[in-house]
Design a protein with these regions (language model features):
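Acidic-basic catalytic patches of nuclease active cores, encompassing PD-(D/E)XK
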Residues: 1-56
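Domain-level recognition of nuclease-like catalytic cores that cleave nucleotide substrates
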Residues: 2-8, 27-32, 107, 111-148
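Conserved catalytic cores of phosphodiester-cleaving nucleases, focusing on short active-site segments
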Residues: 44, 67-84
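Short active-site-proximal "capping" loops at secondary-structure junctions
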Residues: 57-61, 83-84
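Short acidic/glycine-enriched loop/turn segments that link adjacent beta-strands
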Residues: 60-63, 121-122
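Short connector loops at helix/strand junctions that flank enzyme active sites
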Residues: 62-64, 73-77, 108-110
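A short beta-strand motif that forms the metal-chelation/ATP-contact edge
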Residues: 66-69, 125-127
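Short, charged, amphipathic alpha-helix that recurs within catalytic cores of restriction-modification
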Residues: 83-115
Length: 148
């Protein structure tokens, strides 16, 4: 038995649901998300926030948001998703990473984990009050971010 045999047998094959994307399709989808993140940073800066996009090329075990912003005694951590559909799903693990990221910043009085959904003609923001799965639809109204 060789090391290759051991390596091949340790990981069971996962059953992928749906169709496999080509590299061009995958790149286009990621670029659509990156544009939404950059757009959000511009919007936050226009409202007086100090905002930055955290460019992470692959899913990470580190608790990093897509975008974070500060203003006064408040820090916001955003998970950003964009779609051409009418709903966006946020997994519990993504919300947990936002909460873990915010817990590192003890100096801020207000800390908010915010789920941001960019639809074709509208942004929707939802404050994640607890670690759970969330769905944002395009007919929802945004949560109040800083004053709540």
């Amino acid at each position: 038995m060789s090391l290759r045999d051991i390596a091949e047998k340790t990981k069971p094959k996962s059953k992928r649901r749906g169709r496999k994307l080509s590299s061009n399709e995958s790149r286009r989808i990621r670029a659509y998300g990156h544009r939404a993140e950059r757009d959000l940073v511009k919007k936050l800066r226009a409202k007086g926030f100090k905002a930055v996009r955290v460019p992470v090329s692959a899913p990470s075990s580190e608790p990093l948001p897509d975008v974070f912003a500060t203003k006064g005694g408040c820090i916001l951590a955003f998970e950003v998703k964009s779609t051409r559909s009418d709903r966006i799903y946020f997994k519990q693990e993504q919300v947990k990473k936002l909460v873990e990221f915010l817990s590192m910043f003890e100096v801020y009085d207000k800390k908010k984990a915010v789920l941001a959904g960019k639809f074709p003609y509208k942004w929707v923001f939802k404050v994640a009050d607890k670690i759970d799965n969330y769905i944002i639809t395009d007919n929802e109204e945004s949560s109040e971010l800083v004053n709540s």
